[in-house]
């Protein structure tokens, strides 16, 4: 039984997963912050990413959608420092990471999605004065442990 308790173990465990497994896990990480999404396209992107049978053509299509949503969210953030919009931007980045092809990003899709999800929660923390990012990190450890133990 695997129990992830720190970022070192978290990253090592992620590196041991194949790309398809990382995509499925990345989708779970994004699902945990979906309430912070500010673009409706993200839900469809993650629905596709979460399917084990998602084909390359479909993944490419939703990657374009995720990138467009990320750009739109980034534009909405503006110079005002709207932390809710910042959170939405990071959710879009996490969704983009989940469907990015193999070898195109440092650390793989699950790592990038996890870090962007934490950034989304950091933005929420600034807006609400709660420790949302710390809770997200622990939730990710649990999601990964459950994922590994179910295999």
Where are these regions (language model features)?
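Structured binding/interaction patches within domain cores
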Residues: 1-151
